[in-house]
From Swiss-Prot:
Keywords: Leucine-rich repeat, Repeat. One of its GO terms (cellular component) is Cul2-RING ubiquitin ligase complex. Belongs to the PRAME family. This is PRAME family member 17. SUPFAM superfamilies: RNI-like (SSF52047). It comes from Homo sapiens (Human). GO terms for molecular function: ubiquitin-like ligase-substrate adaptor activity.
Length: 474
Protein backbone atom coordinates (compact mmCIF):
# COMPACT_ATOMS: atom_id res chain seq x y z
CA UNK A 1 0.00 0.00 0.00
CA UNK A 2 1.44 3.35 -1.05
CA UNK A 3 1.66 6.12 1.50
CA UNK A 4 -0.12 9.39 0.71
CA UNK A 5 1.12 12.75 1.96
CA UNK A 6 -1.16 14.62 4.39
CA UNK A 7 -1.88 17.27 1.79
CA UNK A 8 -2.85 14.61 -0.76
CA UNK A 9 -5.19 13.01 1.74
CA UNK A 10 -6.82 16.39 2.37
CA UNK A 11 -7.29 16.82 -1.37
CA UNK A 12 -8.93 13.41 -1.72
CA UNK A 13 -11.15 14.11 1.28
CA UNK A 14 -12.28 17.38 -0.26
CA UNK A 15 -13.08 15.70 -3.57
CA UNK A 16 -15.07 13.03 -1.72
CA UNK A 17 -17.10 15.67 0.11
CA UNK A 18 -17.95 17.34 -3.18
CA UNK A 19 -18.86 14.11 -4.99
CA UNK A 20 -21.06 12.84 -2.18
CA UNK A 21 -22.55 16.28 -1.51
CA UNK A 22 -21.70 16.06 2.21
CA UNK A 23 -20.37 19.59 2.30
CA UNK A 24 -21.80 21.85 5.02
CA UNK A 25 -20.74 25.19 6.42
CA UNK A 26 -19.76 23.43 9.66
CA UNK A 27 -17.42 21.05 7.84
CA UNK A 28 -15.89 23.93 5.90
CA UNK A 29 -15.16 25.77 9.12
CA UNK A 30 -12.94 22.89 10.21
CA UNK A 31 -11.03 22.37 6.96
CA UNK A 32 -7.52 23.84 6.58
CA UNK A 33 -7.38 26.75 4.18
CA UNK A 34 -4.91 24.97 1.88
CA UNK A 35 -7.78 22.76 0.69
CA UNK A 36 -10.12 25.56 -0.36
CA UNK A 37 -8.65 26.63 -3.72
CA UNK A 38 -8.56 23.11 -5.14
CA UNK A 39 -12.03 22.30 -3.82
CA UNK A 40 -13.34 25.53 -5.29
CA UNK A 41 -11.81 24.67 -8.67
CA UNK A 42 -13.39 21.21 -8.53
CA UNK A 43 -16.79 22.60 -7.58
CA UNK A 44 -16.60 25.18 -10.37
CA UNK A 45 -15.61 22.68 -13.06
CA UNK A 46 -18.25 20.17 -11.91
CA UNK A 47 -20.91 22.91 -11.65
CA UNK A 48 -21.64 22.15 -7.99
CA UNK A 49 -23.31 25.50 -7.41
CA UNK A 50 -24.53 24.76 -3.88
CA UNK A 51 -20.98 23.87 -2.89
CA UNK A 52 -19.70 27.13 -4.39
CA UNK A 53 -22.31 29.05 -2.45
CA UNK A 54 -21.18 27.42 0.82
CA UNK A 55 -17.46 27.80 0.13
CA UNK A 56 -17.80 31.53 -0.46
CA UNK A 57 -19.28 31.86 3.03
CA UNK A 58 -16.20 30.23 4.57
CA UNK A 59 -13.56 31.53 2.14
CA UNK A 60 -10.35 31.94 4.19
CA UNK A 61 -8.54 34.47 1.95
CA UNK A 62 -8.86 38.20 1.45
CA UNK A 63 -9.42 37.87 -2.30
CA UNK A 64 -11.41 35.46 -4.44
CA UNK A 65 -10.04 35.77 -8.02
CA UNK A 66 -13.06 34.27 -9.72
CA UNK A 67 -12.38 35.95 -13.07
CA UNK A 68 -9.04 34.21 -13.59
CA UNK A 69 -10.71 30.87 -12.82
CA UNK A 70 -13.74 31.27 -15.09
CA UNK A 71 -11.86 32.93 -17.98
CA UNK A 72 -15.18 33.18 -19.84
CA UNK A 73 -18.01 34.61 -17.69
CA UNK A 74 -20.51 31.96 -16.59
CA UNK A 75 -23.82 33.26 -15.27
CA UNK A 76 -24.77 30.34 -13.00
CA UNK A 77 -21.33 30.30 -11.36
CA UNK A 78 -21.56 34.04 -10.76
CA UNK A 79 -25.07 33.68 -9.35
CA UNK A 80 -23.94 30.96 -6.93
CA UNK A 81 -21.06 33.08 -5.65
CA UNK A 82 -23.26 36.15 -5.22
CA UNK A 83 -25.88 34.12 -3.37
CA UNK A 84 -23.18 32.96 -0.98
CA UNK A 85 -22.18 36.58 -0.44
CA UNK A 86 -25.81 37.49 0.19
CA UNK A 87 -25.92 35.01 3.07
CA UNK A 88 -22.84 36.64 4.59
CA UNK A 89 -23.95 40.21 4.03
CA UNK A 90 -27.27 39.51 5.74
CA UNK A 91 -25.53 38.51 8.98
CA UNK A 92 -24.95 41.16 11.61
CA UNK A 93 -22.24 39.03 13.24
CA UNK A 94 -19.87 37.83 10.58
CA UNK A 95 -18.51 34.27 10.75
CA UNK A 96 -15.30 33.69 12.66
CA UNK A 97 -13.42 32.63 9.56
CA UNK A 98 -14.66 35.16 7.04
CA UNK A 99 -11.79 37.18 5.60
CA UNK A 100 -13.06 37.85 2.08
CA UNK A 101 -12.88 41.53 1.17
CA UNK A 102 -12.50 41.42 -2.63
CA UNK A 103 -14.33 39.43 -5.29
CA UNK A 104 -12.20 39.89 -8.40
CA UNK A 105 -13.98 39.16 -11.68
CA UNK A 106 -11.00 40.26 -13.79
CA UNK A 107 -8.64 37.77 -15.39
CA UNK A 108 -5.58 39.13 -13.60
CA UNK A 109 -4.55 36.71 -10.85
CA UNK A 110 -4.04 33.22 -12.28
CA UNK A 111 -1.06 32.70 -9.95
CA UNK A 112 -3.41 32.34 -7.01
CA UNK A 113 -4.83 29.08 -8.29
CA UNK A 114 -1.37 27.82 -9.26
CA UNK A 115 0.17 28.58 -5.88
CA UNK A 116 -2.57 27.18 -3.70
CA UNK A 117 -3.59 24.13 -5.70
CA UNK A 118 -2.26 21.32 -7.85
CA UNK A 119 1.29 20.04 -7.79
CA UNK A 120 2.79 23.21 -6.29
CA UNK A 121 0.50 23.14 -3.28
CA UNK A 122 0.95 19.41 -2.78
CA UNK A 123 4.73 19.78 -2.87
CA UNK A 124 4.75 22.36 -0.06
CA UNK A 125 4.61 21.60 3.61
CA UNK A 126 1.97 23.35 5.75
CA UNK A 127 4.78 25.40 7.26
CA UNK A 128 5.91 26.60 3.83
CA UNK A 129 2.38 27.43 2.80
CA UNK A 130 1.83 29.44 5.97
CA UNK A 131 4.84 31.60 5.09
CA UNK A 132 2.96 32.78 2.00
CA UNK A 133 0.60 34.62 4.27
CA UNK A 134 1.15 38.34 4.49
CA UNK A 135 -0.32 41.02 6.67
CA UNK A 136 -3.13 41.30 4.12
CA UNK A 137 -4.19 37.70 4.82
CA UNK A 138 -5.49 38.74 8.20
CA UNK A 139 -8.86 40.46 8.61
CA UNK A 140 -8.91 44.12 9.45
CA UNK A 141 -10.20 45.22 12.80
CA UNK A 142 -12.80 47.84 13.45
CA UNK A 143 -15.91 48.53 11.41
CA UNK A 144 -16.88 46.25 8.56
CA UNK A 145 -15.56 47.50 5.24
CA UNK A 146 -17.79 47.26 2.15
CA UNK A 147 -17.08 44.23 0.02
CA UNK A 148 -15.31 45.22 -3.22
CA UNK A 149 -16.18 43.60 -6.54
CA UNK A 150 -13.62 44.33 -9.26
CA UNK A 151 -14.48 44.09 -12.95
CA UNK A 152 -13.09 45.06 -16.34
CA UNK A 153 -15.54 47.38 -18.05
CA UNK A 154 -14.96 47.64 -21.79
CA UNK A 155 -18.33 48.26 -23.38
CA UNK A 156 -18.10 47.51 -27.10
CA UNK A 157 -21.78 46.63 -27.48
CA UNK A 158 -24.78 48.88 -27.04
CA UNK A 159 -26.18 46.70 -24.24
CA UNK A 160 -24.73 44.82 -21.25
CA UNK A 161 -24.05 41.09 -21.44
CA UNK A 162 -26.11 38.87 -19.13
CA UNK A 163 -23.41 38.51 -16.45
CA UNK A 164 -22.72 42.23 -16.20
CA UNK A 165 -26.43 43.02 -16.28
CA UNK A 166 -27.08 40.58 -13.42
CA UNK A 167 -24.13 41.93 -11.43
CA UNK A 168 -25.28 45.55 -11.83
CA UNK A 169 -28.77 44.69 -10.59
CA UNK A 170 -27.26 42.81 -7.65
CA UNK A 171 -25.01 45.76 -6.78
CA UNK A 172 -27.89 48.23 -7.06
CA UNK A 173 -29.83 46.63 -4.20
CA UNK A 174 -26.80 46.36 -1.91
CA UNK A 175 -25.62 49.94 -1.79
CA UNK A 176 -23.40 50.61 1.18
CA UNK A 177 -22.57 46.92 1.54
CA UNK A 178 -20.83 46.36 -1.79
CA UNK A 179 -18.70 48.60 -4.01
CA UNK A 180 -18.45 47.82 -7.72
CA UNK A 181 -14.87 48.80 -8.58
CA UNK A 182 -13.32 49.32 -11.98
CA UNK A 183 -9.86 50.80 -12.58
CA UNK A 184 -10.44 51.35 -16.29
CA UNK A 185 -13.80 52.13 -17.89
CA UNK A 186 -14.20 52.13 -21.67
CA UNK A 187 -17.32 52.84 -23.70
CA UNK A 188 -17.35 52.49 -27.46
CA UNK A 189 -20.97 51.71 -28.30
CA UNK A 190 -23.34 52.20 -25.37
CA UNK A 191 -25.70 55.19 -25.70
CA UNK A 192 -24.82 58.12 -23.48
CA UNK A 193 -27.89 57.82 -21.23
CA UNK A 194 -27.35 54.09 -20.66
CA UNK A 195 -23.67 54.62 -19.97
CA UNK A 196 -24.43 57.29 -17.38
CA UNK A 197 -26.73 54.83 -15.62
CA UNK A 198 -23.93 52.28 -15.65
CA UNK A 199 -21.49 54.79 -14.16
CA UNK A 200 -23.90 55.26 -11.26
CA UNK A 201 -23.26 51.64 -10.26
CA UNK A 202 -19.45 51.94 -10.27
CA UNK A 203 -17.69 53.16 -7.12
CA UNK A 204 -16.25 56.47 -8.39
CA UNK A 205 -13.04 56.42 -6.32
CA UNK A 206 -11.97 53.20 -8.04
CA UNK A 207 -11.90 54.68 -11.56
CA UNK A 208 -8.41 55.69 -12.69
CA UNK A 209 -8.92 55.72 -16.46
CA UNK A 210 -12.07 56.71 -18.34
CA UNK A 211 -12.29 56.38 -22.10
CA UNK A 212 -15.40 57.40 -24.01
CA UNK A 213 -15.52 57.12 -27.80
CA UNK A 214 -18.94 57.82 -29.21
CA UNK A 215 -20.43 59.84 -32.01
CA UNK A 216 -22.03 62.78 -30.26
CA UNK A 217 -21.48 66.47 -29.71
CA UNK A 218 -18.40 67.74 -27.90
CA UNK A 219 -20.78 69.86 -25.82
CA UNK A 220 -22.15 66.70 -24.20
CA UNK A 221 -19.10 66.51 -21.96
CA UNK A 222 -21.09 68.55 -19.49
CA UNK A 223 -23.53 65.67 -19.01
CA UNK A 224 -20.75 63.61 -17.43
CA UNK A 225 -19.79 66.36 -15.00
CA UNK A 226 -21.76 65.03 -11.98
CA UNK A 227 -19.99 61.66 -12.29
CA UNK A 228 -16.55 62.99 -13.16
CA UNK A 229 -16.62 65.28 -10.14
CA UNK A 230 -16.75 62.21 -7.87
CA UNK A 231 -13.78 60.39 -9.47
CA UNK A 232 -11.10 61.61 -7.09
CA UNK A 233 -8.47 59.14 -8.35
CA UNK A 234 -9.02 59.66 -12.08
CA UNK A 235 -5.68 59.93 -13.87
CA UNK A 236 -6.57 59.58 -17.53
CA UNK A 237 -9.57 60.87 -19.43
CA UNK A 238 -10.04 60.30 -23.14
CA UNK A 239 -13.11 61.77 -24.81
CA UNK A 240 -13.73 61.24 -28.51
CA UNK A 241 -17.09 62.62 -29.60
CA UNK A 242 -17.56 61.90 -33.29
CA UNK A 243 -15.16 60.32 -35.73
CA UNK A 244 -12.58 63.12 -35.60
CA UNK A 245 -13.05 65.17 -32.44
CA UNK A 246 -10.79 63.95 -29.64
CA UNK A 247 -9.87 65.39 -26.27
CA UNK A 248 -7.46 63.53 -24.00
CA UNK A 249 -6.47 64.55 -20.50
CA UNK A 250 -4.06 62.54 -18.38
CA UNK A 251 -3.15 62.94 -14.73
CA UNK A 252 -4.72 62.91 -11.32
CA UNK A 253 -7.54 65.36 -11.49
CA UNK A 254 -10.67 66.64 -9.82
CA UNK A 255 -13.68 67.88 -11.73
CA UNK A 256 -16.05 70.64 -10.71
CA UNK A 257 -19.41 70.39 -12.51
CA UNK A 258 -20.16 73.22 -14.87
CA UNK A 259 -23.06 72.29 -17.10
CA UNK A 260 -23.06 75.60 -18.96
CA UNK A 261 -19.79 74.92 -20.77
CA UNK A 262 -18.44 72.07 -22.87
CA UNK A 263 -15.42 71.51 -20.63
CA UNK A 264 -14.91 70.97 -16.93
CA UNK A 265 -12.54 72.47 -14.41
CA UNK A 266 -9.43 70.31 -14.33
CA UNK A 267 -7.27 70.65 -11.22
CA UNK A 268 -4.41 68.15 -11.44
CA UNK A 269 -3.91 67.08 -15.06
CA UNK A 270 -0.52 66.03 -16.37
CA UNK A 271 -1.25 65.81 -20.08
CA UNK A 272 -3.64 67.45 -22.51
CA UNK A 273 -4.07 65.89 -25.94
CA UNK A 274 -6.25 67.53 -28.59
CA UNK A 275 -6.66 66.00 -32.02
CA UNK A 276 -8.90 66.98 -34.91
CA UNK A 277 -11.20 69.24 -32.92
CA UNK A 278 -12.91 71.03 -35.77
CA UNK A 279 -14.45 73.77 -33.61
CA UNK A 280 -11.45 74.27 -31.34
CA UNK A 281 -11.53 78.04 -31.92
CA UNK A 282 -14.66 78.16 -29.78
CA UNK A 283 -13.19 76.12 -26.94
CA UNK A 284 -9.39 76.37 -26.70
CA UNK A 285 -9.33 79.54 -24.62
CA UNK A 286 -11.97 78.23 -22.24
CA UNK A 287 -10.22 74.87 -21.95
CA UNK A 288 -6.89 76.45 -21.04
CA UNK A 289 -8.67 78.64 -18.50
CA UNK A 290 -10.15 75.51 -16.89
CA UNK A 291 -6.70 74.05 -16.28
CA UNK A 292 -6.03 75.25 -12.76
CA UNK A 293 -2.50 73.86 -12.36
CA UNK A 294 0.43 73.64 -14.80
CA UNK A 295 0.46 70.87 -17.39
CA UNK A 296 3.46 68.66 -17.99
CA UNK A 297 2.64 67.78 -21.60
CA UNK A 298 0.58 69.56 -24.26
CA UNK A 299 -0.12 67.79 -27.57
CA UNK A 300 -2.11 69.46 -30.33
CA UNK A 301 -2.56 67.65 -33.65
CA UNK A 302 -4.26 68.02 -37.04
CA UNK A 303 -5.89 71.41 -36.71
CA UNK A 304 -5.58 75.05 -37.68
CA UNK A 305 -4.47 77.63 -35.14
CA UNK A 306 -5.60 81.17 -35.81
CA UNK A 307 -3.68 84.11 -34.35
CA UNK A 308 -6.20 84.36 -31.52
CA UNK A 309 -5.69 80.68 -30.65
CA UNK A 310 -1.93 81.07 -30.73
CA UNK A 311 -2.14 83.96 -28.29
CA UNK A 312 -3.98 81.70 -25.84
CA UNK A 313 -0.97 79.41 -25.65
CA UNK A 314 1.23 82.08 -24.12
CA UNK A 315 -1.30 83.74 -21.84
CA UNK A 316 -2.41 81.01 -19.43
CA UNK A 317 -0.36 79.76 -16.45
CA UNK A 318 -1.42 76.18 -17.19
CA UNK A 319 1.22 76.04 -19.96
CA UNK A 320 3.98 77.80 -18.03
CA UNK A 321 5.89 74.70 -16.85
CA UNK A 322 5.68 72.36 -19.81
CA UNK A 323 8.18 69.55 -20.15
CA UNK A 324 6.81 68.47 -23.52
CA UNK A 325 5.22 70.57 -26.26
CA UNK A 326 4.01 68.83 -29.41
CA UNK A 327 2.41 70.75 -32.28
CA UNK A 328 1.83 68.28 -35.10
CA UNK A 329 0.21 68.92 -38.46
CA UNK A 330 -0.84 72.40 -37.38
CA UNK A 331 -1.09 74.69 -40.41
CA UNK A 332 0.94 77.77 -39.47
CA UNK A 333 2.14 79.32 -42.71
CA UNK A 334 -0.06 82.40 -42.21
CA UNK A 335 0.02 82.43 -38.40
CA UNK A 336 1.87 84.99 -36.30
CA UNK A 337 4.33 82.91 -34.26
CA UNK A 338 5.32 85.63 -31.81
CA UNK A 339 2.96 84.16 -29.17
CA UNK A 340 4.59 80.75 -29.68
CA UNK A 341 7.96 82.41 -29.14
CA UNK A 342 6.60 83.95 -25.95
CA UNK A 343 5.47 80.50 -24.81
CA UNK A 344 8.92 79.02 -25.49
CA UNK A 345 10.43 81.87 -23.50
CA UNK A 346 8.11 81.06 -20.61
CA UNK A 347 8.94 77.33 -20.56
CA UNK A 348 12.66 77.67 -21.39
CA UNK A 349 13.72 76.39 -17.96
CA UNK A 350 11.54 73.25 -18.05
CA UNK A 351 11.00 72.21 -21.68
CA UNK A 352 12.67 68.89 -22.55
CA UNK A 353 10.91 67.80 -25.75
CA UNK A 354 9.77 70.14 -28.52
CA UNK A 355 7.94 68.89 -31.61
CA UNK A 356 7.02 71.25 -34.44
CA UNK A 357 6.20 68.65 -37.07
CA UNK A 358 4.50 69.21 -40.44
CA UNK A 359 3.55 72.77 -39.52
CA UNK A 360 4.80 74.36 -42.79
CA UNK A 361 6.77 76.97 -40.87
CA UNK A 362 8.47 79.44 -43.23
CA UNK A 363 11.87 81.17 -42.88
CA UNK A 364 10.44 84.45 -41.59
CA UNK A 365 8.36 82.65 -38.98
CA UNK A 366 11.31 80.54 -37.84
CA UNK A 367 13.39 83.64 -37.17
CA UNK A 368 10.75 84.79 -34.66
CA UNK A 369 11.23 81.60 -32.62
CA UNK A 370 15.03 81.47 -32.53
CA UNK A 371 15.77 83.79 -29.55
CA UNK A 372 13.42 81.86 -27.28
CA UNK A 373 14.52 78.47 -28.62
CA UNK A 374 18.15 79.26 -27.83
CA UNK A 375 17.23 79.61 -24.13
CA UNK A 376 15.61 76.16 -23.80
CA UNK A 377 18.58 74.77 -21.91
CA UNK A 378 16.87 71.53 -20.80
CA UNK A 379 15.89 70.48 -24.32
CA UNK A 380 16.81 66.86 -25.12
CA UNK A 381 14.70 66.26 -28.25
CA UNK A 382 13.86 68.68 -31.05
CA UNK A 383 11.63 67.50 -33.90
CA UNK A 384 11.35 70.03 -36.72
CA UNK A 385 10.53 67.91 -39.77
CA UNK A 386 7.85 68.88 -42.27
CA UNK A 387 8.56 72.62 -42.41
CA UNK A 388 9.42 74.79 -45.41
CA UNK A 389 12.83 76.25 -44.59
CA UNK A 390 15.85 77.16 -46.67
CA UNK A 391 19.47 76.17 -46.11
CA UNK A 392 20.33 79.59 -44.69
CA UNK A 393 17.39 79.46 -42.29
CA UNK A 394 18.47 76.02 -41.07
CA UNK A 395 22.03 77.26 -40.58
CA UNK A 396 20.69 80.13 -38.50
CA UNK A 397 18.60 77.67 -36.50
CA UNK A 398 21.59 75.40 -35.82
CA UNK A 399 23.70 78.36 -34.69
CA UNK A 400 21.05 79.26 -32.13
CA UNK A 401 21.26 75.76 -30.61
CA UNK A 402 24.87 76.23 -29.49
CA UNK A 403 23.90 76.46 -25.83
CA UNK A 404 21.61 73.42 -25.89
CA UNK A 405 24.15 70.93 -24.60
CA UNK A 406 21.54 68.35 -23.55
CA UNK A 407 20.15 67.85 -27.05
CA UNK A 408 20.37 64.14 -27.78
CA UNK A 409 18.08 63.81 -30.80
CA UNK A 410 17.44 66.35 -33.56
CA UNK A 411 15.33 65.89 -36.67
CA UNK A 412 15.27 68.59 -39.35
CA UNK A 413 13.65 68.85 -42.78
CA UNK A 414 15.59 68.72 -46.00
CA UNK A 415 16.14 72.35 -47.10
CA UNK A 416 13.90 73.70 -49.85
CA UNK A 417 16.88 73.72 -52.25
CA UNK A 418 16.93 69.90 -52.11
CA UNK A 419 13.31 69.38 -53.14
CA UNK A 420 11.99 68.83 -56.66
CA UNK A 421 8.69 70.14 -58.01
CA UNK A 422 6.80 67.31 -56.33
CA UNK A 423 8.43 67.91 -52.96
CA UNK A 424 10.65 64.83 -53.14
CA UNK A 425 14.23 64.96 -51.86
CA UNK A 426 17.07 64.99 -54.35
CA UNK A 427 19.69 63.08 -52.39
CA UNK A 428 22.56 64.19 -54.61
CA UNK A 429 21.82 67.81 -53.74
CA UNK A 430 21.13 67.05 -50.09
CA UNK A 431 24.48 65.34 -49.44
CA UNK A 432 26.74 68.42 -49.85
CA UNK A 433 24.18 70.72 -48.18
CA UNK A 434 24.00 68.36 -45.25
CA UNK A 435 27.80 68.51 -44.98
CA UNK A 436 27.57 72.32 -44.84
CA UNK A 437 24.92 72.14 -42.13
CA UNK A 438 26.97 69.70 -40.06
CA UNK A 439 30.01 71.96 -40.37
CA UNK A 440 27.95 74.92 -39.19
CA UNK A 441 26.64 72.93 -36.24
CA UNK A 442 30.05 71.62 -35.16
CA UNK A 443 31.31 75.17 -34.90
CA UNK A 444 28.94 75.76 -31.97
CA UNK A 445 28.58 72.27 -30.40
CA UNK A 446 29.05 68.56 -30.99
CA UNK A 447 25.77 66.85 -31.97
CA UNK A 448 24.78 63.36 -30.80
CA UNK A 449 21.93 61.99 -32.94
CA UNK A 450 20.84 64.14 -35.85
CA UNK A 451 18.94 63.61 -39.09
CA UNK A 452 18.19 65.80 -42.10
CA UNK A 453 15.43 64.93 -44.55
CA UNK A 454 12.57 62.43 -44.52
CA UNK A 455 12.60 59.42 -42.23
CA UNK A 456 12.80 56.60 -42.80
CA UNK A 457 15.05 57.08 -45.82
CA UNK A 458 12.90 56.27 -48.90
CA UNK A 459 15.86 54.53 -50.55
CA UNK A 460 17.30 52.32 -47.81
CA UNK A 461 14.66 52.55 -45.07
CA UNK A 462 17.14 53.69 -42.42
CA UNK A 463 16.13 55.71 -39.36
CA UNK A 464 18.25 58.19 -37.41
CA UNK A 465 21.45 56.42 -36.44
CA UNK A 466 23.05 56.28 -33.03
CA UNK A 467 26.04 57.93 -34.72
CA UNK A 468 26.20 61.26 -36.47
CA UNK A 469 27.99 59.94 -39.55
CA UNK A 470 25.32 57.45 -40.59
CA UNK A 471 24.96 56.13 -44.12
CA UNK A 472 23.44 58.69 -46.47
CA UNK A 473 21.97 57.32 -49.68
CA UNK A 474 23.35 58.81 -52.88
Amino acid sequence: MSLQSPSRLLELAGQSLLRNQFLTIFILDELPREVFPLMFMEASSMRHFEALKLMVQAWPFLRLPLGSLMKTPHLETLQAVLKGLDTLLAQKLRPRRWKLQVLDLRDVDGNFWTIWSGARALSCSPEAMSKRQTVEDYPRTGEHQPLKVFIDLCQKESTLDECLSYLCRWIHYRRGLVHLCCNKVQNYSMPTSSFRNLLKRVYPDSIQELEIKRKCSLNKTGKFAPYLSQMSNLRKLFLAFGYDDELYVSGQQQFVPDLDCPFLCLYYPQMLYIRKISNIKEHLEHLLRCLKNPLGTFIFCHAYLADQDMECLSQYPSLSQLKELHLIHILMWTTNLEPLGALLEKVAATLEILTLKDCQIQDSQLRVLLPALSRCSQLTTFYFRGNETSTNALKDLLCHTGGLSKLGLELYPAPLECLDNRGHVNWEILAPIRAELMCTLREVRQPKRIFFGPIPCPSCGSWPSEKVDFHLCS
